[in-house]
């Protein structure tokens, strides 16, 4: 027996019923009954509709806030020290599994220590992280506008 010869067991698969396709079976109302809200296309109430009374969601108080700031993929200094190599860009960090979400910018933070000279290409970095990398003989390369901000912080 070969892979292309495999077939499902007899009677285990059933064709989908095509409704509303002529008078041969489920035609006219297509199993929806006559008239009424449930018979219309796009019918149905929202999942939180409670028959017209104030919904539970509107009765409970609001909590927290939505942060309008940028959400970063965060990398710690200590994580860089464990990795092989001395130059880290986004691709290298993704390969190492430190960056998971590709649509988020990468930020370097100063948690942990870096004991060798490394070059790091990131979208943002804390001032303490930049100092720590430079103290170890390395450098942090940021987009232009951010580089000036980090230098002012020193």
UniProtKB/Swiss-Prot annotation:
A single GO cellular-component term on record: cytosolic large ribosomal subunit
**Biased-composition ranges for Basic and acidic residues?**
1-13
One example of the protein's molecular function in GO is: structural constituent of ribosome
| Keyword S-adenosyl-L-methionine carried by entry | no
Q: Which InterPro entries match?
A: Ribosomal_uL15, Ribosomal_uL15/eL18, Ribosomal_uL15/eL18_sf, Ribosomal_uL15_bac-type, Ribosomal_uL15_CS
The entry's family comment says: Belongs to the universal ribosomal protein uL15 family.
Xref: Pfam families: Ribosomal_L27A
Tell me the domain of life. Bacteria
PROSITE patterns membership = RIBOSOMAL_L15
One biological process term in Gene Ontology: translation
* Complex formation: Part of the 50S ribosomal subunit.
Native source species: Deinococcus deserti (strain DSM 17065 / CIP 109153 / LMG 22923 / VCD115)
Q: Which UniProt keywords apply?
A: Ribonucleoprotein, Ribosomal protein, RNA-binding, rRNA-binding
Give the start-end ranges of region Disordered: 1-52
Signal peptide interval: none
Q: What does this protein do?
A: Binds to the 23S rRNA.
- Designated name of the protein: Large ribosomal subunit protein uL15
Keyword Ribonucleoprotein applies: yes
Organism lineage? Bacteria, Thermotogati, Deinococcota, Deinococci, Deinococcales
